[in-house]
């Protein structure tokens, strides 16, 4: 996890990097279908919404759910967005002291 953004546009040009987890092209039945397990989406959204680098973009279907695919909104996504809007400011400090734990403020 500590190298998730290493050698990426997010690292090199964060002001130009729009980060997203899913979009209308990647949902089931679409041309670029990719499967991201529902249990992992809150973790993935945490990484793009709570970190300083990049411009996060939240997929409508993850926020409101996708009725035709019987998919519910992502648990705690609204809370993550609220946390970002209220508390995400100032320079970020990473704490990568342990190989299995990622921390940042």
Model segments located where?
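Active-site-proximal helices and loops of the catalytic beta/alpha 8
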Residues: 1-105
